[in-house]
Amino acid sequence: MGRRRSHERRDLPPNLYIRNNGYYCYRDPRTGKEFGLGRDRRIAITEAIQANIELFSGHKHKPLTARINSDNSVTLHSWLDRYEKILASRGIKQKTLINYMSKIKAIRRGLPDAPLEDITTKEIAAMLNGYIDEGKAASAKLIRSTLSDAFREAIAEGHITTNHVAATRAAKSEVRRSRLTADEYLKIYQAAESSPCWLRLAMELAVVTGQRVGDLCEMKWSDIVDGYLYVEQSKTGVKIAIPTALHIDALGISMKETLDKCKEILGGETIIASTRREPLSSGTVSRYFMRARKASGLSFEGDPPTFHELRSLSARLYEKQISDKFAQHLLGHKSDTMASQYRDDRGREWDKIEIK
């Protein structure tokens, strides 16, 4: 039978002890470490009870007064429901919206459904660091950006006053994909001789227009009007009109000549078409490019370049040939002045690119 506690110790909560000199100590049951609480019995008992609740509950304890005051607070998950509607109202592309939803799903998994004001920077950092520790710094960066935007919207609607995401570190995601040089392009182009004829033409069009592979596959002959190729970029919604008089001197590519070859050889409704004159998917184009790259015998440091790197090559060549401003304009990257113009036009006007 265990030893009976003395009268002084009898009514003390678990883990609270009183020394012979009347000094109270709390012993952490997990480590055995003791913490002094002074000689005031009432304060010592209150502190010990609170510590026991927090240690044994398995989660952060919230005082009753705080719970009463937060009954009308918006929780994180309910706010994310609202945030999804805000995103839908922005008129963004379906693919971009799907990307947002995947990040929101990750946030729901990684953070508790607590009131927004109770989500701490420490909790957010722990979630993001989990991705970084798994080598997913790029994912951490995108999730952080989405969560920060959600918090900014919550501030705008008056639910919180502070964006706790802002205090976290932005993950540094290293781009491991190798850049493609003009000489390497020519070697891959040569290796593509045994590929379907449309691959070389797609490579030429990608470099001379600077557009993404998905937009290349969507280009139609009806998009060419009065010497301009009209492109609405699927990723950003940017509308640009590219002059067909463009040419890349370093590679000897003329946009007009490439278009003429596409018309004569492919003859489909889309500018880039299969041997059956049918539209091609971006996956098919990228896959055949990868085969030609392997056939070229080239080796690269880091991840080998994909078809998308032709866009970067285009920008670098035009930067040398014309100007950095022209290259960024062609890619659809908006300067502050251009962004202002887009807002004024409300997306109704096409941005004509001029060769200067």
Swiss-Prot record:
Q: Which GO terms describe its molecular function?
A: DNA binding; hydrolase activity; integrase activity; transferase activity
- UniProt cross-references to Gene3D superfamilies, sorted A to Z: 1.10.150.130, Classic Zinc Finger, Intergrase catalytic core
* Keywords, sorted A to Z: DNA integration, DNA recombination, DNA-binding, Hydrolase, Transferase, Viral genome excision, Viral genome integration, Virus entry into host cell
Task: Please state every residue range assigned to the domain named Core-binding (CB).
Answer: 74-155
Per the record, the GO terms for biological process are:
DNA integration; DNA recombination; establishment of integrated proviral latency; provirus excision; symbiont entry into host cell; viral genome integration into host DNA
> What's its EC?
2.7.7.-, 3.1.-.-
Q: Has keyword Transferase?
A: yes
InterPro entries, alphabetically? CB, DNA-bd_dom_sf, DNA_brk_join_enz, Integrase-like_cat_sf, Integrase_catalytic, Integrase_lambda-typ_DNA-bd_N, Integrase_recombinase_N, Integrase_SAM-like_N
The Tyr recombinase domain, residue ranges: 175-355
Q: Where is the active site?
A: 212, 235, 308, 311, 333, 342
| The protein's role, per its UniProt record | Integrase is necessary for integration of the phage into the host genome by site-specific recombination. In conjunction with excisionase, integrase is also necessary for excision of the prophage from the host genome.
Q: Which family does it belong to?
A: Belongs to the 'phage' integrase family.
Subunit-structure text? Homotetramer. Interacts (via N-terminus) with the excisionase (via C-terminus). Part of the excision complex made of the integrase tetramer, IHF, Fis and Xis.
- Provide the protein name: Integrase
Q: What gene name is given for the protein in this entry?
A: int
